[in-house]
């Protein structure tokens, strides 16, 4: 006898697409291909195609929020350099269902690298509608993997490696339109400003020898955006406090209890954070001209009257806005683990 059920290599999901003159029509046209009624309450993730994101996402967001079945907490991502079909055709090595793979990536990136963070449909919609603030959402791209041939003793074996996906930085918007892509370090620079950088690794050079590298594990961090008016012009001061602890050290580690070297490491850590924020500022102010940091919103909160005078001209003010950075880095004591393995030998 044989047990009923699908073959072990059969996909546990079905990919289907439809078209229409409007989003609602395209959704209704799905009924011509699906024998079952689609329940949108099960939807956990929305992927935005690059071309559609560049033309504007308001119609899609409006559709999602008007549908009483759709969860406003559903995550949203933007696809880069690929079509939705190409993304849906990829495989996750350790997950049979793509949606579990996407959520695994989001969890890992947020808690391990701080180069991206989840955004829901509701959060994206609110940032689009909020004055003085532009949204950023995770960026997804396809990782191309060529077919491989591997030889085993006495035989030839062909191994087909499917394409996969990865979260690579973030997508920057201006109003409801995609305007560009942030690389990993630029994305973390945005997260430093927003106070969302909680995990990841910073690499600094050893104060004793620039040829040696030290890995710093990012701990807790916080930020404060302080708007000021100096000589009748707006100025932003960003204060970032970050904790870290040395995780990997090239060479002798006995210097960790030397106060002057410890202070030098903290200065170098602060310099790396400053550099990442500067990279993000350059992208936001010069490349995209999009206030992805919410500086305008900070001015509105502190100076509501003055904001009414400058808000219509904010798009011209923001690219040349002076931003002052105050970075405070604190390294935790290494505890009992001081001597490295090589030194102990």
Q: Where are these predicted regions, by residue range?
A:
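Membrane-proximal alpha-helical signals and transmembrane carboxylates
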Residues: 1-345
């Amino acid at each position: 006898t044989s047990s009923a059920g699908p073959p072990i290599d059969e996909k546990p999901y079905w990919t289907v697409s439809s078209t229409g003159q409007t989003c609602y029509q395209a959704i209704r046209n799905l009924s011509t291909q699906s024998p079952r009624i689609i329940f949108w309450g099960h939807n956990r993730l929305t992927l935005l195609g690059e071309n559609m994101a560049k033309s504007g996402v308001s119609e899609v967001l409006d559709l999602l929020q008007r549908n009483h079945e759709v969860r406003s907490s559903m995550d949203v991502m933007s696809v880069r350099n690929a079509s939705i079909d190409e993304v849906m055709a990829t495989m996750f090595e350790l997950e049979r269902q793509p949606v579990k793979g996407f959520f695994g990536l989001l969890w890992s990136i947020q808690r391990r690298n701080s180069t991206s963070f989840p955004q829901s449909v509701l959060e994206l919609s609110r940032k689009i509608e909020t004055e003085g603030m532009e949204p950023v959402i995770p960026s997804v791209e396809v990782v191309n993997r060529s077919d491989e041939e591997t030889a085993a003793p006495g035989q030839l074996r062909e191994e087909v490696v499917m394409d996969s996906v990865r979260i690579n930085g973030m997508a920057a918007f201006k109003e409801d339109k995609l305007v560009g892509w942030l690389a990993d370090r630029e994305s973390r620079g945005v997260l430093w400003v927003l106070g969302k950088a909680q995990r990841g690794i910073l690499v600094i050079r050893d104060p004793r020898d620039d040829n040696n590298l030290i890995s710093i594990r990012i701990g807790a961090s916080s930020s404060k955006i302080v708007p000021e008016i100096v000589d009748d012009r707006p100025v932003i001061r960003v204060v970032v406090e970050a904790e870290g602890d040395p995780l990997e050290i090239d060479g002798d580690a006995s210097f960790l209890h030397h106060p002057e070297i410890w202070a030098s490491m903290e200065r170098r850590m602060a310099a790396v954070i400053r550099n990442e924020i500067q990279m993000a500022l350059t992208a936001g102010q010069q490349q995209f001209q999009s206030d992805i940091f919410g500086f305008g919103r900070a001015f509105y909160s502190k100076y509501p009257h003055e904001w009414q005078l400058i808000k219509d001209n904010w798009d011209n003010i923001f690219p040349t806005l002076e931003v002052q950075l105050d970075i405070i880095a604190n390294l935790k004591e290494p505890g009992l683990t001081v001597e490295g393995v090589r030194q102990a030998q």
